[in-house]
Amino acid sequence: MPPPRTREGRGHRDRDHHRAPREEEAPEKWDWNCPETRCLLEDVFFRDEDYIRRGSEECQKFWAFFERLQRFQHLKTSQKKKKDPGMPKHGIAALADLPLTYDPRYRINLSILSPDTRGRHGPGRGLPPERVSEFRRALLHYLDFQQKQAFGRLAKLQRERAALPIAQYGNRILQTLKEHQVVVVAGDTGCGKSTQVPQYLLAAGFSHVACTQPRRIACISLAKRVGFESLSQYGSQVGYQIRFESTRSAATKIVFLTVGLLLRQIQREPSLPQYQVLIVDEVHERHLHNDFLLGVLQRLLPQRPDLKVILMSATINISLFSSYFSHAPVVQVPGRLFPITVVYQPQEADQTASKSEKLDPRPFLRVLEAIDNKYPPEERGDLLVFLSGMAEITTVLDAAQAYASLTQRWVVLPLHSALSVSDQDKVFDVAPAGVRKCILSTNIAETSVTIDGIRFVVDSGKVKEMSYDPQAKLQRLQEFWISQASAEQRKGRAGRTGPGVCYRLYAESDYDAFAPYPVPEIRRVALDALVLQMKSMSVGDPRTFPFIEPPPPASVETAILYLQEQGALDSSEALTPIGSLLAQLPVDVVIGKMLILGSMFSLAEPVLTIAAALSVQSPFTRSAQSNLDCATARRPLESDQGDPFTLFNVFNAWVQVKSERSGNSRKWCRRRGVEEHRLYEMANLRRQFKELLEDHGLLSGAQVVAPGDSYSRLQQRRERRALHQLKRQHEEGGGRRRKVLRLQEDGCSSDEEDRKGSTSQRADSVDIQDVKFKLRHNLEQLQAAASSAQDLTRDQLALLKLVLGRGLYPQLAVPDAFNSGRKDSDQIFHTQAKQGTVLHPTCVFANSPEVLHTQGQEASGQEGSQDGRDQMSCKHQLLAFVSLLETNKPYLVNCVRIPALQSLLLFSRSIDTNGDCSRLVADGWLELQLADSESAVRLLATSLRLRAHWESALDRQLARQAQRRKLEQEEDVGSPAVSPQEVAALSRELLQFMAAKVPYRLRRLTGLEAQNLYVGPQTITTAPSLPGLFGNSTLSPHPTKGGYAVSDYLTYNCLTSDTDLYSDCLRSFWTCPHCGLHMPFTPLERIAHENTCPEAPGDDPGSEEAAPAPPQKTSALQRPYHCQVCGQDFLFTPTEVLRHRRQHV
């Protein structure tokens, strides 16, 4: 008989009845892969303050681990059900509290907070408790797995560090540093000095250590490596500081920074009180700034006896560095190179290419074929080929890729500085099984880049180095034989990970004839930037500075003269106000001048962009030059005004694409053959320039306008929070991961790239450069500046070209007289020091040179004249260029066209005239012949006045800002400010002057004409009785040219001609347009009267009530005279008094 049904029992059975279906249905309804389920769990366990943050790469790794764990547990559960013997029971009372079954989680020695301990009102309150517990166990297993992996890496890392050769010398280095102020650590490649010495110092208790590197990429990689080797136990105590980027904080104890940044810090604080130890790495490379830093440290050490210095070098010329620092002790560490077999394969005489021929790629292909025949593909080992330049890399690349497509055993990759960052990173990827990498590199892989897995090296024995020719004033990229030290460095790349082979494509006798060491950079480059920095740091005369190896005296003198010509140094070689500011701008002098000059006018935004664009490498990729599709897509951005304006248009268009939410800037750049990384550099430089100009008061600070409504502000905060999370995720993930390369018919790519295809913008494909760009810059402000700059008026464009022209002067080129009859590629131009230059292939004028020709209706020459030498035109143009680079030809790089006559009158350092001023010679090499002498005199007088006003306004502005900074924003800073009204008036007058239409001839003087240009010193020793052109200036005979020195740049009547000797006595009647005076004047008297006429406009363009300057006495016969009729005061000779009275009759 069944038991009676009670309420309790019935209720219990009902609960069981209702619970049973739910328990049976739960496994079917619960889905771990459901997005809503995962979102709830991430809200509970993966918050911002947790170890794993939601959306991070670590979060994605956990879910992959979780899926594998679920499959494993499901398999284990199904096997357990088949052979389950029943639950065991404890027979011992003491073990009653232990679990009945073993679970691996009991070995996990950590715990995490569960949702119960966080409160029942959190986001996970709707989750079943049993599912939360199951998820928590999975999370514990994952953390335990990660911990075991970390301990495994730690053990491996400690073994690797202990195996480094320098590990046996750590205590010796510290002891030597304790006893001496300077220590030289010399170690061969692979000894570990760059990563281990900073850690030894940190472990020894040093807390302020700076380690300099010659390149930015080395600072980043070493800082990350040191942080990794310390397992981040020092946290933020290891950081790096480079241009535009820094991870340095108040807690940083070791900072890796570039040499240039350390010199800037010395410029601000000469004693470097913030550092205890300075490590100068790679001193053997003999870079310009490294040599200068050593000289600065030699002077600083006696003043800072507590400062320690470690010089780290390869085993190259160690005695030079030791003796420079009073025979500092040397700790020499052996390298860890495996045996390297050297094979000399000199080229035959018929295989040696001449200077005009391409490199013969056959010797390099024979090496590839020899490796294929001798070594089975199962033996790993890649090939590194050292070539002299990009042209040589391209030649060998084409031949090697053809060979690789036949054998399917090679992946050929180029490596040089002009490649995009993504293409450079491919050399670190892994080749598939049975395939080797063939890396074609310049000397960048000699010391700057270390590539693992290299077993074979091919050394061409050549290198291209930049040198400066002070006579021709050009940079020359020439091919040289390398030094023995460089040859050993290249050979060492083959023995880092195992026995290697080095193929030298030259004879052993050639190696013996090599120079032992490379030529220091200080002995072959222009020194103007270095001299300017030395003047700013007040380290004394550059001629007597104690360099480790002094530069050629001629290079120092050339640099000083160049800085004086640019206005950065005065006649006593002291810094001028503009020179002080130029020394603080991290750009060439000409680019810095553009920024300073442009800050005066309302053209700050376009000048900032152009200056930044001219300060980086060309953003146009090398392959895009021959790609018709890229050229067609880029054509709307090209400007017929010149390359700076083309770069200006490219940057503005890119900013517009960036500001569009649906815009794909990477695709936009690729279609136009533009390297986006260069555009990011432009944006960073532009911001830095703007901040520097704002700091010096030359540019008003931008007002950041916040979004008006609360929703927009909230949306902006969310976007920045997401960007910060993406950046943190990238940094935690270690950046770019190595990929597996795959063979393709036209080159190579990575498997990951192929998988992404057109979906490269997915969430898991983070463009870290784009993230940093949006965090660093205000995109709305950039877009507004780009939009306004696209609508430059004609006046703004003319004024902008004027600023660029003055900034680039004296870097001018004049077109050859026969260019109109030449092909586009044969256009020839001449500079003052170099004849026969041509346009660079990337120049916009190389494809459309007709805009530089003076012909048709704009020119009126003699009938039948085809060469343009006798053309009278008001449209003659000059090319202002940023640099002159000679490779196989001398090329003009980054050119802009400017009007010839007005530019020469405003910029020339020397202007010489004949008697009636119809013939002018600028800087002793360009001749201007004007048909109308009256127009010539009028233009000359106007240019004199405008130059004086411009110089005065610029000097007052710079001097006022310098005084303001010096007196810390005091109200009375001495010199008057430059008012906006004055700047606006000066701009209007400059534009009117530039718009003047005066026909003239332009030609370059021959060498013989330049030698017989001047009349020479005259027997007349006194100046004519003429009022001065300026307030305190007086006329005096020029001691060498002859004629009369009107100003420091204008010499009147000094050019040879039949009438020049008597022209100062030849007068013609002229009526003053201001006071109506009608009398005979010489051209010089007319200029003088126009500048001192009481009825003429005041000298101050911005002051309407400015009183005229009092006349200055320039002759012994002049006496003060007050006219009763007109009420004016004059300084007149008796004859001039009679003339003045006659005009009132």
UniProtKB/Swiss-Prot annotation:
SMART domains in the record: DEXDc, HA2, HELICc
UniProt xrefs under CDD domains: DEXHc_DHX34, SF2_C_RHA
Biased composition (Basic and acidic residues): 1-14
Record's subunit section: Forms a complex with RUVBL1 and RUVBL2. Part of a complex composed of SMG1, DHX34 and UPF1; within the complex DHX34 acts as a scaffolding protein to facilitate SMG1 phosphorylation of UPF1. Interacts with UPF1, MOV10, EIF4A3, XRN2, SMG6, SMG7, SMG9, UPF3A, UPF3B, CASC3/MLN51, XRN1, DIS3 and DCP1A; the interactions are RNA-independent. Interacts with NCBP1/CPB80; the interaction is RNA-dependent. Interacts (via C-terminus) with SMG1; the interaction is RNA-independent.
Chain ranges for the short sequence motif DEAH box as given in the UniProt record: 281-284
Helicase ATP-binding domain location: 174-334
Segments crossing the lipid bilayer: none
Name this protein carries in UniProt: Probable ATP-dependent RNA helicase DHX34
